[in-house]
Amino acid sequence: MTHGIGFDRDKYIQLQSEHINERREQIGGKLYLEMGGKLFDDYHASRVLPGFTPDNKIAMLENIKEDVEIVVCLNARDLERGKVRADLSIPYEEDALRLVDVFRDRGFRVNNVVLTQLEDSNHMAVAFAERLERLGLNVARHRVIPGYPTNTELVVSDGGFGLNDYVETSRDLVVVTAPGPGSGKLATCLSQVYHEFRRGVPAGYAKFETFPIWNLPLEHPVNLAYEAATADLDDINVIDPFHLQAYGKQVTSYNRDVEVFPLLKTLLEKLYGHSPYQSPTDMGVNMVGHCISDDELCREAAKQEIVRRYYKALVDERREDTDDTVSSRVAIVMSKVGASTKDRRVVAAANEVEERTGEPGSALELADGTIITGKTSELLGCSAAMLLNALKHLAGLDDDIHLLSPKSIEPIQTLKVDHLGSQNPRLHTDEVLIALSVSAAESEDARAALKQLKNLAGCDVHTTTILGSVDEGIFRNLGVLVTSEPKYWRKALYRKR
């Protein structure tokens, strides 16, 4: 568990907004800004750059809000695949709606959604487009372009970008964002630049991608943590070969930017006679690397994130009964930074509980390094027991104090099993917290324990079995960073999610 501040949030907000305005002046017209990563809930960045808050990027954009219009992209194939945003456990299409709501709530203009790689045979995407229109949003349909991005002659023509719908916008700074990677943000930006040129409107493109950080070494743990996070896409960090050739300097980029750069350069040269960019790095505006205040702290935080990503990959493969392709990729990244599962202290502690009791176990590391464990009993699941134990410790209560009496737990178990059809009588984390809240009406100890919930944010947890969706959701809402062993507590073919 990493504690401390390794990133200067205020410096970042100032530097980044200034640099975007500088790029706008250089372009001298409409700027399409591809915004990679999460705009207002970038939890990955907040984990690997301690001090970077999840809303850091949107806070920066609020400095120039009156000039900004936001366009949300969604890959139609992700709808067909049922892709889910892992940190929130919601499908990409629902996250697209959530994004629109949150942007609007913060005062940003957002009226357009682009469905990329759309085919008429994709009935889910076609139906979603109709749903968006019923909700009052404008939907642009972008088709699959054969040979994209390598066949530049076709792509930059009426038979390529020319077939895409044009997105009507009214501001000079258009931020293009998406629920996740691979959504078609770059293609949308380039398509818009093409259409603006046909309409006689000067327009340019820039990229705001937090990771990889161009001015950190290729195999810096923070950059490798990004590689681990996108292992399912097979993204890899690379030295920008175009930048090296143009300037003789080694900087970090990643494979998809390098692959698509010839298309960008060709597009700009074809439209305007020249390209202002000689490399993928040139087109970026990322100032994150200039705001790291404690490199060692960020390195350690990134190593911990890579280990978490490894466990996540293992669990995903077990849940979906897929091969070990993704976890193997993350394992390679983990070895590059010299990390292992042993570096996550809660792993050994949780496994020791299971070895000792023969039942699922869990462990939590508090901010001061104290390890709190939980075991499975007739009344409580191990996660619920661990949660109560942690709250007691934080509240300074004796271990032998019962925050919940067996008499208060048994009626809840009866309700679960006899009336609600549950096969597991043990209380989950949500049920324990509700019971604790009820007890707080009369118990000062329970009230003291509840007040400590805020101190669990950022704590690491490990469980020896895969968590159910309820426990996952509770830990996520508390800000707890959970990993699990890739196995279930009971054998079954059907798993409720």
Swiss-Prot record:
Lineage of the organism: Bacteria, Bacillati, Actinomycetota, Actinomycetes, Mycobacteriales
Bilayer-crossing regions: none
Homology family: Belongs to the UPF0371 family.
Protein name: UPF0371 protein cu0538
Lineage top rank: taxon: Bacteria
